[in-house]
């Protein structure tokens, strides 16, 4: 790029930031706030802090309205059957046709477009692209997550958990289990998978938290600016990291992605989107699984004791934690054609908010759904990892980390108790704890 163009680009950066925020967060916030004021459940869910802390009563209100009801931005479903149908349907996609958007929005999207400010839920992240691009990205990534590849990760996860627990042995009094364990384990495991230096983990945690915030629509301007700063730092790191692995490749997933043969090679933007998604999705969700699990088991002490006595039950326990308090609560799809769902005609372009956390408490599928029971026979029928072509590619690894992480913790600190008030993260799409004070002994 000529120097003058670079200077011009930098000079436009603040304006771009404002436009990007306005179109991605400012405008949705106006709609959602208006909806919330008129009692719209989706508006309340996404905009009301009290509902964010405890969304389950609102899900039940929605369930009473039926399996698919109108909200401020399209339709919304709390139903397991409808969510499964939509997530698996080829009449729904994750992308949206920008060419159909009003002209000012198209202009804003084009003007605000910049690789280094792109978040994990923006194209070309595989989370938000449809086939054939989705198929292409997914095929490349899923090679690293075959059952055999995940099983090979078991010693890494165990070793990482053990060394974190060794460090915890030296602590006394109340410790924050998120900071010392629940966040550390997944970030170290994903660092290993992507060959990123473990010393940078504090940066990843900071960047990941900012990236996670951008998943929620309607972010206030200041939080967006902070998030964008973190995204820029993350992209700068990725650029360096990929250049290093191009020069000196290893056996890891990123080395493989940057040295694909020409006919499969990803563009620079696609590489950034893919690695950034893996990095963020790899720990932002799993830390919630661990934190939510500890709090649930602390509240159901007899089940913690039963798992200590019979550790083979941890597989089922992790499924029940995922079901009962799902780390990802919300996703969405857009109808690509006219389609009939739950007796309703859905027209092309209609957005459906899919409440995974509500589907996982659907009484048509789960007996007494609010009861937490690690022995629940069909807990694994949950949609915590979604369904269809976007089904979580890292589900096997997440399950492994959940089982090893919680089992190892219970073995090392059998008397562990939550001590003080756990603090929820200020997020809607992801559900987990920011702080989790515990007494280890
Ligand atoms: C408890 C932990 C986790 C949960 C609850 C979770 C949940 C999810 C969900 C719900 C989706 C799909 C969203 C949708 O359908 O719109 C998803 C997609 C994805 N997850 Fe996970 N995830 C977890 C851990 C992981 C891990 C450990 C990794 C990677 C190492 C990962 C990588 C991905 C990727 C790359 C996608 C996009 C897949 C696609 O679009 O085809 N996740 N995850």
Q: Whereabouts are the PLM-identified features?
A:
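Cytochrome P450
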Residues: 1-441
